[in-house]
Amino acid sequence: MGVDTESARPSMLVLARESRAMTQADVAEAMTKALDGEGVVSQGYVSKAESGRLAVFGDRLALYAQALRYTPHLLCFDGDAEGAGVGLIHHRKKASLATTSLRTVHAQLNLVRLQLRNLLQAVEVRPAVLFERIEVDDRETAEDAAQTLRARWDLPPGPIESVVGAIESAGGLVIRRPLAGRELDAVSQWPEGENPIFIVNALAPADRQRFTLSHELGHVAMHVVPNGLQEQQADQFAAEFLLPARDIESDLRTHIDLDRLYELKKVWRVSMATLLRRAQTLGAVSGWRHRQLTIELSTLGYRTAEPQTFPPEKPALIPALIRHLQQERQLAVADLACLAGLHEDEFIDFFLAEAGTP
């Protein structure tokens, strides 16, 4: 079906605009600029298009897509384009993150979900989902949930070699890309009947990415309905998932100082600050000692930038699916970009650049 017969879905017009952090006035201005003096598009037109009060097709669809820097096909995507009904969106963010920035990231996540859905349909074999919902209550704690998931996924005792690898082996789809500067660590979603999706901020340090992914994993496993304790529970889940009490206690028995935390960081592949918090939680250091070492970390500038002892973990599942489409289905990058509703250069940047896939 070509541009002449396709018609944009109003919800996709909103989603595409928000993913670009544009206002309706911005879209109208971009469309007017693209007309190169041959007409003017008003903000009112964009508002009517987004509300479904007028149809967008043909040349006007192509113009709209040009302004939003997507393909016309993306604006016609079928399916749920908004968060309602497709699964609770979780995110790990700083309080300073603006609401508009969060809306942009949520829109980007929903677009990624639709793009991956199209790519997975082309593969024809969706990765098996080994995730499960684990209800946390007075009897089942977040730590219990982490132990349950480690056992279900057959993760050996001790440090997890790759959090990304563990999630992907269970059918989770992981993407690394810059998100809202350093104000947002990750965003995740587990839509009903689909694979869980995790987008982690590529700008974050490697140690923080591992904890963040584990935190998001806790969310998708435990939190179908939001609650006031969910951030605390996700942190507790992540701590036990990455640093199981029964496995790390022996490492915390010796005198804890910055040198010891640095050595343990190499083994457990989490930040020194995370190890220090875990040591206090498990009673290996007192509250006074925790405060003292926190001050030392801050004095050295480690609260914002610790020495990195290992590289970031790179996702492999999505690049492997794309390679399958290239090799087995003989699809060129241009074909894949079309499925995702992206121009070729942006498709490469979003899905292939980090993996080095041609």
Residue ranges and their predicted role:
Residues M1-P358:
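Active-site hotspot residues in diverse enzymes, especially metal/ion-binding acidic/histidine motifs
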